[in-house]
């Protein structure tokens, strides 16, 4: 099954999206946006940037866990991954975003 985006609205009227893999696992979480239109632009940015290896910033948290940020051409963070135990599992997460990030399916939960 192909991945999809889920768009949601928080209790303080901000918007965020997540990218889900085909198995339902969240593989990328956006920053908060003040408008739905901005969040939708963020989804469009994931679609255009996720296939490009150079858009992934690989990081290590202070607790030793691994994660990545997907960045736009202007170096702004579009979304961040979960924490991974190993660098290899982080690479698997990046590969999943590359495959699922071009999805045209958006489940609007706003």
UniProtKB/Swiss-Prot annotation:
Task: List, alphabetically, the SUPFAM superfamilies matched.
Answer: YegP-like (SSF160113)
Q: Sorted alphabetically, which Gene3D superfamilies does this protein's record hold?
A: 2.30.29.80
- Which residues are listed as membrane-spanning? none
Residue ranges of sequence repeats: 10-58, 61-109
Decide whether keyword Repeat is in the record: yes
Keyword annotations from UniProtKB, A to Z: Repeat
Which InterPro entries has this protein been placed in?
Answer: DUF1508, UPF0339_domain, YegP-like_sf
Q: Quick check: keyword Repeat in the entry? A: yes
Q: Which residues form the signal peptide?
A: none
Which Pfam families does this UniProt record tie to the protein?
DUF1508
Q: Which family does it belong to?
A: Belongs to the UPF0339 family. Duplicated subfamily.
Q: What is the protein's name according to its record?
A: UPF0339 protein YegP
Protein's organism: Escherichia coli O6:H1 (strain CFT073 / ATCC 700928 / UPEC)
Upper taxonomic classification of the species? Bacteria, Pseudomonadati, Pseudomonadota, Gammaproteobacteria, Enterobacterales
